[in-house]
């Protein structure tokens, strides 16, 4: 007897796996070199959403020091973005890379938005990288990684800062923040390796390990003539006077000096970071930093 399947419900098709989030995968590259008794941008690869200005000469007493503004043409970091910035300072080059405004990190998903920075600094080169804060919007999921390779005699100032902000004023937290720092010698040996992670609810909770502070910044100083003397140049007092809570300590393996700042908000943090940056910049470069145009 034949068996009929007419009238039986069809077997449901297997559910399709959700597509992984797709963000932008972009790498920008800048190379500063010594040429004609000054510092020139000898190579640049700057795809969207990165954008740079021309190199400015903002230090009459040090005309060889180039200042360059890095900008975002897309309005910030979005879900699952993976943006990488590589900067090299060749021997004798002196460069200051900064921004004109903070970078917004928008709501993310399971896969974080990633920002990687890779710095290579040759002997007798000076590189200062001090962007404005990353601003974490509600639901932002961000992973930041900074890797520095420095030759003996290299000088560098590298800052990083984050603040949180809810545009509608409801105090909604970001999702999660991962921070990583690695400093290597030219042979690839890791001198410093730091990792930290905090979720937004813990960051903003009444019992937060940050206390009442809602903004956090770090500064790495490499190649100072005397770290102990630099630490004594009232760095803590300068940042504290701006409203920050500041710590200064030597980095492992004699790599340099590290600073950490806490502040109630991004504006206060920026003021404290700028106060410290001015002191360190003048110590390492021999001139006061030019006033940044905003």
Curated annotation (Swiss-Prot):
Gene Ontology MF terms: nickel cation binding
Protein known as: Urease accessory protein UreD 1
HAMAP family, per the entry: UreD
Compositional bias (Pro residues): 11-21
Biological role stated in the UniProt entry: Required for maturation of urease via the functional incorporation of the urease nickel metallocenter.
Subunit structure: UreD, UreF and UreG form a complex that acts as a GTP-hydrolysis-dependent molecular chaperone, activating the urease apoprotein by helping to assemble the nickel containing metallocenter of UreC. The UreE protein probably delivers the nickel.
Region (Disordered): 1-22
The gene coding this protein: ureD1
Origin superkingdom: Bacteria
Entry keywords, A to Z: Chaperone, Cytoplasm, Nickel insertion
Family: Belongs to the UreD family.
GO CC field: cytoplasm
Localization in the cell: Cytoplasm
Stretch forming the signal peptide: none
């Amino acid at each position: 007897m034949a068996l009929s399947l007419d009238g039986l419900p069809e077997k449901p098709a297997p559910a399709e796996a959700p597509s992984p989030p797709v963000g932008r995968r972009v790498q920008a590259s800048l190379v500063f070199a010594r040429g004609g008794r000054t510092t020139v941008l000898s190579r640049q690869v700057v795809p969207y959403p990165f954008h740079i200005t021309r190199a400015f000469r903002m230090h009459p007493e040090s005309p060889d020091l180039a200042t360059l503004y890095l900008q975002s043409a897309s309005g910030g970091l979005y879900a699952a973005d993976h943006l990488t910035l590589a900067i090299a300072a060749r021997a004798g080059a002196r460069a200051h890379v900064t921004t004109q405004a903070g970078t917004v990190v928008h709501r993310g998903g399971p896969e974080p938005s990633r920002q990687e920075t890779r710095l290579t600094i040759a002997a007798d080169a000076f590189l200062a990288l001090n962007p404005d804060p990353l601003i974490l919007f509600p639901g932002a999921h961000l992973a930041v990684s900074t890797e520095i390779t420095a030759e003996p005699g290299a000088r560098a100032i590298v800052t990083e800062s984050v603040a949180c902000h809810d545009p509608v004023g409801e105090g909604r937290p970001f999702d999660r923040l991962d921070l990583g720092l690695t400093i290597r010698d030219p042979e690839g040996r890791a001198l410093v390796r730091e990792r930290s992670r905090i979720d937004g609810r813990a960051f903003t909770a009444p019992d937060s390990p940050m206390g009442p502070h809602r903004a956090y910044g770090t500064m790495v100083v490499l190649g100072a003539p005397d770290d102990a003397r630099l630490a004594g140049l009232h760095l803590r007092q300068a940042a504290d006077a701006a409203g920050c809570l500041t710590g200064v300590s030597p980095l492992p393996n004699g790599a340099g000096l590290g600073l950490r700042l806490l502040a109630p908000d991004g504006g206060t943090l920026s003021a404290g970071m700028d106060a410290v940056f001015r002191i360190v910049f003048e110590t390492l470069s021999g001139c006061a930093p030019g006033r940044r145009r905003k």
